[in-house]
Design a protein with these regions (language model features):
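Short, well-ordered beta-strand elements within core beta-sheets of diverse protein domains
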Residues: 13-19, 79, 97-102, 207-214
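Short helix-loop capping/hinge segments that flank enzyme active sites or metal/cofactor-binding pockets
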Residues: 73-93, 249-257, 303-332
């Protein structure tokens, strides 16, 4: 048994499973203990069922001891953003409109996780309908600070050592922003790599699924598991996919070169953020070329907002029409 196993990355836990130093039950119990100790302050979880998770962990351990085939995430607990349909768990989308909502439908990405042997520990908090209205989730490093949104709970849960992996979604920075705020790895792969089937739709043009973890290898592994073609997602990619984990662990074949754009909103950054960026650019030295973006780049923020607002009004028209009094003023 490994003490404080909740601190392990998914890759470390898988190695410990293989060597017999750790069981899935021990890991899940450790994660649940960490949640009980800290989530009153962080509020990362919208739904948690420890008993079901432990039953799944026991089955994972039984399969492993029997020498049967195991998947890439066998016995690893994972959190899901609460806009992803998961049979036998509520999907409430951060709004009282869907309080207690359950469906028999299972998102394709949930099927992929279960096929890989992952344990769905519960649902992580999202902003209202995965849009802009903030929730109660706090930043694990400082409860006075925001964890970022809209995948607030997923990023906070990984940063607080509640789970080694979590799934989020991004329409306007909703994976990479909370990952940055909470200090975790966040990865939003190419559009169409991970199926959106069974995920709340707010913008057919912009919605995407992403991953959170505490190491580069972990987010690569999770992306490999989730990635697949899905005929029910109109943008799903049918082309061959590179193995992300292999790529993440390989040496770069050439010295990478980078372009740095001084964006129109850099003047809004804090002094600490600007100093940090400049320090990285100085370390990279000749590998970086500083470039000035076109003036029209500033218009992209307005364009993105118009697309998002128009499409969420389309996709959720029935919800808005029938429940207008339960919609926040910010979303209205």
């Amino acid at each position: 048994m490994i003490q404080d196993s909740y601190k392990l990355t998914a890759s470390e836990a898988l190695d410990a499973f293989a060597s017999g130093r750790l069981s899935s039950v021990e890991l899940v119990k450790s994660c649940i203990g960490q949640i009980k100790a800290t989530d009153d302050r962080i509020k990362a979880w919208a739904f948690l069922d420890g008993n079901v998770a432990l039953a799944q962990a026991e089955e994972c351990d039984r399969i492993r001891k029997a020498g049967l085939a195991t998947g890439a995430l066998h016995g690893i607990p994972v959190g899901l953003k609460d806009i992803i349909d998961t049979a036998k768990m509520p999907t409430q989308c951060g709004t009282p409109i869907f309080s207690g909502r359950r469906t028999d439908h299972v998102a394709r990405l949930v099927e992929r996780l279960r096929e890989a042997g992952a344990i769905i520990l519960g649902k992580t908090v999202t902003t209202e309908l995965a849009f802009v209205h903030a929730n109660e989730t706090r930043n694990p490093h400082n409860p006075d600070h925001s964890p970022g949104g809209s995948s607030s709970g997923s990023a906070a849960a990984v940063a607080a050592f509640h789970v080694p992996l979590a799934v989020g979604t991004q329409t306007n920075g909703s994976v990479i922003r909370p990952a940055s705020f909470c200090g975790t790895f966040g990865f939003k792969p190419t559009r169409g790599v991970i199926s959106r089937s069974g995920v709340l739709q707010t913008s057919v043009s912009l919605d995407q699924v992403g991953c959170f973890g505490r190491s580069l290898a972990d987010v690569a592994l999770l992306t490999d598991v989730l990635g697949c073609y899905d005929q029910y997602d109109t943008v799903s990619l049918a082309r061959p996919r590179p193995n992300m984990l292999t790529g993440a662990q390989a040496e770069a074949p050439v010295t990478p070169e980078f372009a740095w754009f001084d964006l129109p909103f850099n003047d809004r950054l804090s002094t600490d953020a600007r100093d940090g960026i400049e320090a990285v650019l100085e370390i990279l030295g000749p590998q970086v070329t500083r470039m000035q973006p076109a003036d029209t780049l500033a218009d992209l923020v307005t364009v993105q907002a118009r697309i998002h607002e128009y499409e969420i009004a389309q996709h959720q028209a029935e919800v808005f029409d029938q429940n207008w009094d339960q919609i926040s003023d910010i979303l209205k």
